[in-house]
UniProtKB/Swiss-Prot annotation:
It catalyses: N-(5-phospho-beta-D-ribosyl)anthranilate = 1-(2-carboxyphenylamino)-1-deoxy-D-ribulose 5-phosphate. Its EC number is 5.3.1.24. One of its GO terms (biological process) is L-tryptophan biosynthetic process. InterPro entries: Aldolase_TIM, PRAI_dom, RibuloseP-bd_barrel, TrpF_fam. Belongs to the TrpF family. This is N-(5'-phosphoribosyl)anthranilate isomerase. It holds the Pfam family PRAI. HAMAP family: PRAI. GO terms for molecular function: phosphoribosylanthranilate isomerase activity. It comes from the Bacteria.
Length: 206
């Protein structure tokens, strides 16, 4: 079971998550996000993440290919997460030089908003229509992908991770709000530990 901790804004949070076994550490570059990180902080988080064997991920919304590549080159990020549409510009370069996670919105009733075929090797990540809110969609009504590696996000936390994995059998899980201190963007060490350890243990059983 792959675990992605998203919306990381400080190297200490990245370090603790990686030491606990997180596979991906996500940094947000979307302008409107409360978790948006600066380039200097992202570079520090990226260095910490790589040193501990995890993969840093840049999360982008409504940025062009050139903007994404510029940020990745300045920070050392090699995996990017896109949301609901591919960016304008030379997509071929992005697909050639970077690993891609592609977030697909799911309505509250479990229906995929815009079903589409993805290029090979692009990892689909199914999330609520507005990510980072701590809300989930109807897992029981959602039709899980078959014969492909995919990840689940949307309202996950230590209290419901067992139900989520047992219901949908994802290959990876992604969390932000569910492991944060209340009303803050910093991660809670106790929640990080509970979430990551539970996901790893449960993942071995499916």
């Amino acid at each position: 079971m792959k675990v992605k901790i998203c919306g990381v804004t400080h190297p200490e949070d990245a370090e603790y998550a990686a030491l606990l076994g997180a596979d991906y550490i996500g940094m947000i570059f979307a302008e409107k996000s409360k978790r948006k990180t600066s380039l200097s902080m992202a570079k520090s988080i990226t260095n910490t993440t790589k040193r501990l064997g995890a993969e840093p991920v840049g999360v982008f919304v409504e940025q062009t290919t050139d903007q994404i590549i510029a940020i990745c080159e300045q920070t050392g990020i090699k995996t990017v997460q896109l949301h609901n549409s591919f960016p304008s510009g030379s997509l071929e370069k992005l697909l050639r030089d970077y690993s891609i996670i592609y977030a697909i919105s799911v309505r509250e009733n479990g229906d995929v908003c815009h079903p589409q075929s993805l290029p090979p090797k692009v990892i689909p990540l199914y999330d609520t229509e507005k990510g980072g809110t701590g809300k989930q969609f109807n897992w029981k009504a959602f039709s899980s992908p078959r014969d492909t590696f995919w990840m689940l996000a949307g309202g996950l936390n230590p209290a419901n991770i067992e139900e989520a994995i047992a219901t949908l059998h994802p290959n990876g899980v992604d969390v932000a709000t569910g492991v944060e201190f209340p009303n803050k963007t910093r991660k809670d060490p106790d929640l990080l530990k509970a979430f990551i350890q539970s996901a790893k243990i449960l993942g071995e059983k499916i």
